Amino acid sequence: MLLVIDVGNSNIVLGIYDEERLVRDWRVSTDKSKTIDEYGILFHDLFRLADIVFTDVKDIIISSVVPTLTGVLEKLSRQYFKISPYVVGPGIKTGMPIHYDNPKEVGADRIVNAIAGFEKYRTALIIVDFGTATTFDYVNKKGEYCGGAIAPGLAISMEALFMKASKLPRVDIARPPSIIAKNTVNSMQAGIFFGYVGLVDGIVQRMKGEGKENPKVIATGGLASLIAPESVTIEEVDEFLTLEGLRIIYQRNK
């Protein structure tokens, strides 16, 4: 079995693959204060509930945008699984040309998404990933990564409103009953939610205009299923896109 690990700023997503089939997946909060042993215990408990033991895992691949945790999970892989993991970054074969001023600046998760998307759809793509930051990535018809845009994520936007406006409460991210809200909580939700839908559609439409390839628009990430139904540009939600990309990169490097 293959263990794929996607480390984001807010969540760590784990997946277990048996060949090309995703057997189990988990989403846990990212905690930079946790030690190797604490993560080892967490993984052990998750695996035990799924009737999986560490020795079932024959290889590991990691994508991380949190450098401090990259090292922790590399050491965990060696200590608990007796495996030297693949880590997405310099030296890893992706099979995708990256047209960026400095390719090393592109987040590993963005490249992983691009690879998975193009492998699945084989056409020009815009990939919208709703994470701590929301990223927009353009892949052309040749399967080349062309760049993209980064915006504050929904949670960051809502938290900023609470932190910077003294009288506004902290509220959950949700679709309100109406854009013309009747109370403060719904008013904040309306501004963030519908404003964010407009942000997504606006950026996607501008990318389409610049790219001139009529790209397919797919969304992934924790809040994709919340925003996608209101968007006029998102065509499909693929919640496991990043995990699938890690599996593909592993296959290209083993």
Swiss-Prot record:
The active site is at D109 (proton acceptor). It is found in: Cytoplasm. K(+) binds at D129. One of its GO terms (biological process) is coenzyme A biosynthetic process. Keywords: ATP-binding, Coenzyme A biosynthesis, Cytoplasm, Kinase, Metal-binding, Nucleotide-binding, Potassium, Transferase. A monovalent cation. Ammonium or potassium. Pathway: Cofactor biosynthesis; coenzyme A biosynthesis; CoA from (R)-pantothenate: step 1/5. GO terms for cellular component: cytoplasm. ATP binds at D6, V7, G8, N9, S10, N11, I12, V13, T132. Its EC number is 2.7.1.33. GO terms for molecular function: ATP binding; metal ion binding; pantothenate kinase activity. Its cofactor is NH4(+); K(+). It catalyses: (R)-pantothenate + ATP = (R)-4'-phosphopantothenate + ADP + H(+). Gene3D superfamilies: 3.30.420.40. InterPro entries: ATPase_NBD (IPR043129), Type_III_PanK (IPR004619). Substrate binds at Y100, G107, A108, D109, R110, T184. Catalyzes the phosphorylation of pantothenate (Pan), the first step in CoA biosynthesis. Homodimer. Belongs to the type III pantothenate kinase family. This is Type III pantothenate kinase. It comes from Citrifermentans bemidjiense (strain ATCC BAA-1014 / DSM 16622 / JCM 12645 / Bem) (Geobacter bemidjiensis). The lineage of its organism: Bacteria, Pseudomonadati, Thermodesulfobacteriota, Desulfuromonadia, Geobacterales.
